[in-house]
Amino acid sequence: MQYRLEEVMSKSPSFSIIIANYNYGQYVGDAIESALMQDWVSKEVIVIDDGSTDGSINTIKKFGNNVLGFFTKNQGQREANNLGFSMSSGDIIIFLDSDDILIKGALREIASVWHAGVSKIQVLVQRTDAKGRPVGAIMPRIRSGVTPQEIQKQAWLYLDYPSPPGSGNAWSREFLTKIFPLDSKFDSSTDTSCIAMAPYYGDIVTIDRPLVLYRTHGKNDSNLSNGKENYSREVARAFHRLYAVQCACLDTGHPLPKYKVLFENSHLLQLRIASMRLTPRKHSLPGDSLKKAFYDSFKIFLFSKKRRSFFDGMILIWSILAIILPGFLAERMIDFRFSRRILECTVLND
């Protein structure tokens, strides 16, 4: 799609690109450069170094006055982004992970669809290897032309909807002002809370083309197959997501979601099974068991309020096998599913 630059620029939203970095010295320079190279005049780049012990600080300082840099002790991503947001002034906020890259023209495309009442604009992200070469699938898997109303409906039903990871989201300052700063009751990852709460404060607009390069290098937080305990961590994040949504509902007057909604989500079902099979002592979902997950597999498939698809059937089969197979076979199935990211739910599908 082609845009008239003068028409887009007349809208004049300003951008704040906030980069929280911790020990990604080999990547953070690329992230900063991709932000500075955006063909949008009204932008600021804010870099928060969260106590790095590698060469990150020297890399950041090389950009001089082109970036607004802060160097703090290590407190985690949530606190780094709290600081970054407090120092920002843009109408639109992007929390760019320090190992990711904004594709040229990203700000212009985001600005072209920006309008009042939007809580976030989300874009597709292209996976790359550690050197930035495209590999694997584009995320999220989502039907072209999906509407904000469809996303909102799914979020209200399942506390979940198709969303890219952090760098693929451009947030309304008006929305973030209502929820920031995020305190310790929220998840340590900023994405968890912002993504969960956004549908309750405004429209979510999707640009169905990749505008971010998502670097995969083995240390990514989203690489669940890196460690067995990661699945239990993700299940625990479901609590934080539920808490965030409850806060949003109290603030906006929406009905409070019930705890049982956590057992009606097909993606969380897979994480629950992986958590209970691999690290059962760290599984932290009260009332959960493999027996319950077995029954939930059928309930989700048979009684889901969204149209069933081929992937839903495959998820049912995978879930049953991952529950009943001997430990070593179940572990292989879990690793195969999450390391290759097969059975990623096709949501909001035709």
Regions found by a protein language model. Give the residues of each.
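C-terminal subregions of glycosyltransferases and related glycan-biosynthesis enzymes
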Residues: 157, 188, 213-350
